Curated annotation (Swiss-Prot):
Residues 1-72 form the S1-like domain. This is Translation initiation factor IF-1. InterPro entries: NA-bd_OB-fold (IPR012340), RNA-binding_domain_S1_IF1 (IPR006196), TIF_IF1 (IPR004368). It comes from Neisseria gonorrhoeae (strain ATCC 700825 / FA 1090). GO terms for cellular component: cytosol. It comes from the Bacteria. Component of the 30S ribosomal translation pre-initiation complex which assembles on the 30S ribosome in the order IF-2 and IF-3, IF-1 and N-formylmethionyl-tRNA(fMet); mRNA recruitment can occur at any time during PIC assembly. The keyword RNA-binding applies. GO terms for molecular function: ribosome binding; rRNA binding; translation initiation factor activity.
Length: 72
């Protein structure tokens, strides 16, 4: 899958789930399941409920997302 195929959106973490998975409320009020990208995991970036994040969605499954950035 090429990087150009992803859809980037802003969202907010609602709750933490097991295995580094989170419920994310997108700016268009949809709720998706998001997991941390590998680079965020590698650099021990912590995410907690209420954080603003940027997620990448694929056009194939719009219910799952990859968290790629946490806003300060």
């Amino acid at each position: 899958m090429a990087k150009e195929d992803t859809i980037q959106m802003q969202g907010e973490i609602l709750e933490t789930l097991p295995n580094a998975t989170f419920k994310v409320k997108l700016e268009n009020d949809h709720i998706v399941l998001g997991h941390i990208s590998g680079k965020m995991r590698m650099h021990y970036i912590r995410i907690s409920p209420g954080d603003k994040v940027t997620v990448e969605l694929t056009p194939y499954d719009l219910t799952r997302a990859r968290i790629v950035f946490r806003a300060r």
